[in-house]
Amino acid sequence: MSMKKIVALIFGGKSAEHEVSLRSAKNVADALDKDKFTPVLIGISKEGSWYRFPDMGVFTEATKIVDSALPSKAEPVALMSLQGKPVLYSLKDHSKTAVDVAFPILHGTMGEDGTIQGLFKMVQLPFVGCGVWSSAAGMDKEIMKRLLAVAKIPNARYLLLTPHQKNDYNEIVKELGSPFFIKPANAGSSVGVHKIKTAEDFVVKLKDAFQFDTKVLAEEFIQGREVECSVMGHNHAPKASLPGEVIPQHEFYSYEAKYIDDNGALLKIPAELSPETTKAVQKMAEQTYQAMGCDGLTRVDFFIRPNGELYINEINTIPGFTKISMYPKMWEASGLSYKDLISQLIQLGFEKFEGEQSLKTSYLD
């Protein structure tokens, strides 16, 4: 009988989505098949420090991890490579723990943007999810839109705003119409996203958006249904779930609607779409997955206009795994249980790593 694999569940992080990450991580830890895997819980504080936690108590003791008020039994650790093998090194007692695979559940910056994926590759640790460049491109909404344009995949029109240029409300309205949205290029969970209706509102809300990124997109408002689709698999063979629909009860699907107001949105899973529209959503989700170089998992978000036209809103390379998160729910509606989903995602991580290990890293040998 094969030994159980040690899975490092990594959560928290120096991100505006830190608290959401802890909620996701608890659900993944609960769903992990303990007959196949042994979890190691690694929380990254809001300051960027790494800690190992001995049990699930971390999720009940705190909604966030901060260096000044750590949950009990937090052990400072570092991820490193020793003799070509990835290990967790204790900064407390200098012990070393072997790790077989990482499951990053880090939403937003310093986790979903390719940074930690680069660390995993440096220490030769298999990991769940997209690689460095697809994570970075998926996180940056402007780069995502450029890649989708090359692939001729429709998405909302936009303008790029920076702090160093004149950002004129009237020019934006002339180009995109009114109302329009502004959103930080590198943020998720609707952090810093605002619907703009007046010049006065634009000044205030743009200042808020620039708190989260140095690039902000002004994006046209698309009147239509908000539909999402889960995708998993290797880049050459993606598989899409049945779509689900989000019906916001706020003006749009804001951070508050997602995570604070229990009645912030209605979720219909599967979405009530015609068979033809369902297939079109699944096909475009898979095309987007491939165009963005995704591997492992991604959630693809759509707008559907009243005339049936599909537009990509964005992709999420580490989608939420909270109680209300669409990614696992859409797979459950498609016949894949939460536990089996997690197991398959881990297996995909191992397969991707094995394929990369077969590549040569020396030219003269």
From Swiss-Prot:
Domain (ATP-grasp) ranges:
145-347
Task: Just give the chief location class.
Answer: cytoplasm
Keyword list (alphabetical) reads:
ATP-binding, Cell shape, Cell wall biogenesis/degradation, Cytoplasm, Ligase, Magnesium, Manganese, Metal-binding, Nucleotide-binding, Peptidoglycan synthesis
Name the reaction it catalyses: 2 D-alanine + ATP = D-alanyl-D-alanine + ADP + phosphate + H(+)
This entry carries the following GO cellular component terms, namely: cytosol
Q: Which cofactors does it use?
A: Mg(2+); Mn(2+)
Localized where? Cytoplasm
* Residues reported to bind ATP: 173-228
Q: What is its EC number?
A: 6.3.2.4
Q: How is the cofactor bound?
A: Binds 2 magnesium or manganese ions per subunit.
KW Ligase (keyword) present: yes
Q: Which GO terms describe its biological process?
A: cell wall organization; peptidoglycan biosynthetic process; regulation of cell shape
Q: Which PROSITE patterns match?
A: ATP_GRASP, DALA_DALA_LIGASE_1, DALA_DALA_LIGASE_2
The residues that hold Mg(2+) 2 are E314, N316
Family matches, as Pfam families: Dala_Dala_lig_C (PF07478), Dala_Dala_lig_N (PF01820)
A GO term for molecular function:
metal ion binding
Gene3D superfamilies named in the record = 3.40.50.20, ATP-grasp fold, A domain, ATP-grasp fold, B domain
Q: Which domain of life is it from?
A: Bacteria
The reply to whether Cytoplasm figures as a keyword in the UniProt entry is: yes
Functional note: Cell wall formation.
Q: Which PANTHER family match?
A: D-ALANINE--D-ALANINE LIGASE, D-ALANINE--D-ALANINE LIGASE A
Q: Which family does it belong to?
A: Belongs to the D-alanine--D-alanine ligase family.
What name is this protein filed under? D-alanine--D-alanine ligase
Can you name the source organism?
Bdellovibrio bacteriovorus (strain ATCC 15356 / DSM 50701 / NCIMB 9529 / HD100)
Q: Which gene encodes it?
A: ddl
